[in-house]
């Protein structure tokens, strides 16, 4: 329903994120007039040898990278043609690109992305690898204006949500970046997540442990490592392979410690969501009811959300756990949980919000 509160909030939120008035108008009007215009515009420029460079800019824009350093654009262009000239490219595509000192910005990115598909994984991988290699920090802990380009270009979550690459192609992308990016822990976290979603749990564990050796106190690293152990354990249990219970319990204990650790309090909601959701999945995979101690721990963590703003995903999880308790003779846990569940939701989030960044 486009007129529901949830739909209106999503539209307003998206418009506020736009830095391009045409993209904002496109989003708010469903964009058909703009789309028709730029479809004709793309057709007119279809034979242009610089078209792949424009496509590369659109792929990066879908990951939240709207502005690029001029030398990076030149590198991307020279991969397509040794004769590539940035000034000529800007002149040809002045409708959709502009240059400020040192940087090139893509405009109409949202519209163009709807017209330019993701059916060239080779070009997409090439583009993202070029961006990552150009923008990779010189050393761990260094952050400058290019760091966000590096992080967005290899973010598994962003790439999956954008629909640019399959999970197997994401792994291929990161395998090609090990040598130039191996000194940065963020790379190893993404490499680990990519291995995990491809079912390569041992590789994922190795990559994430390497990241932890570089940043032992990072929430992102510790959360990803604990989550991998739990997912790995459930995979083993569902396939009747190895000691899945041991793997899962090790990860669950680590996630619980993260959840109750005060220094990670800003990310409490993510830890609780992962811990409780995975225990419910464990119960389903093993066809075993949670023991009373585990159920009490889950309930206690959820009850502490009383002091945190709720979103729709947390509300849904609390409701799911209440139903679980009611169906498995643990009704004494329900009254306190219902008090939390009755708190009005403060905001709406998509499912992907709780995926590891």
What residue spans do the PLM features occupy?
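Alpha-helical repeat scaffolds
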Residues: 128-132, 165-178, 202-213, 239-262, ...
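TPR repeat positional signature
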Residues: 150, 188, 222, 229, ...
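C-terminal leucine-rich, beta-strand-based interaction scaffolds used for sensing/assembly
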Residues: 62-216, 220-223, 227, 247
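Polyanionic, low-complexity intrinsically disordered segments
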Residues: 188-189, 285, 313, 349
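Amphipathic alpha-helical "lid/sensor" segments that cap RecA-like P-loop NTPase cores
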Residues: 1-66
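Residue at a conserved register position within TPR or TPR-like alpha-solenoid repeats
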Residues: 195, 229, 236, 279-281, ...
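Residue-level recognition of tetratricopeptide repeat
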Residues: 184, 218-219, 225, 263-270, ...
């Amino acid at each position: 329903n486009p007129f529901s509160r949830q739909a209106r909030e999503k539209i307003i939120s998206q418009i506020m994120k736009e830095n391009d008035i045409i993209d904002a108008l496109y989003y708010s009007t469903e964009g058909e007039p703009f789309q028709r215009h730029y479809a004709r515009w793309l057709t007119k420029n279809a034979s242009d040898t610089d078209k792949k460079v424009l496509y590369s800019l659109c792929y990066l824009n879908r990951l939240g990278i709207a502005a690029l350093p001029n030398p990076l654009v030149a590198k991307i262009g020279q991969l397509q043609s040794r004769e590539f000239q940035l000034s000529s490219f800007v002149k040809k595509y002045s409708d959709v690109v502009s240059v400020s000192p040192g940087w090139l910005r893509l405009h109409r990115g949202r519209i163009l992305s709807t017209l330019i598909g993701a059916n060239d994984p080779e070009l997409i991988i090439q583009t993202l690898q070029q961006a990552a290699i150009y923008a990779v920090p010189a050393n761990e802990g260094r952050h400058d204006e290019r760091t966000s380009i590096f992080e967005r270009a290899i973010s598994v979550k962003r790439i999956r949500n954008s629909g640019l690459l399959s999970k197997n192609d994401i792994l291929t992308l990161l395998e090609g970046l090990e040598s130039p990016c191996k000194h940065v822990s963020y790379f190893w976290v993404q490499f680990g997540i990519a291995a995990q979603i491809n079912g390569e749990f041992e590789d994922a564990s190795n990559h994430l442990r390497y990241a932890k050796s570089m940043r032992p106190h990072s929430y992102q690293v510790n959360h990803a490592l604990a989550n991998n152990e739990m997912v790995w354990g459930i995979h083993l249990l569902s396939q009747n392979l190895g000691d899945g219970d041991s793997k899962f319990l090790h990860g669950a204990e680590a996630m619980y410690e993260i959840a109750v650790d005060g220094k990670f309090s800003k990310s409490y909601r993510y830890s609780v969501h992962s811990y409780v959701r995975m225990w419910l999945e464990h119960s389903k995979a093993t066809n075993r009811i949670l023991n009373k101690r585990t159920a009490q721990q889950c309930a206690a963590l959820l009850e502490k959300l009383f002091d945190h703003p709720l979103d729709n995903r947390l509300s849904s999880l609390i409701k799911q756990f209440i139903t679980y308790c009611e169906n498995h003779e643990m009704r004494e846990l329900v009254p306190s949980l219902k008090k939390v569940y009755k708190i009005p939701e403060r905001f709406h989030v998509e499912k992907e919000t709780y995926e590891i960044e």
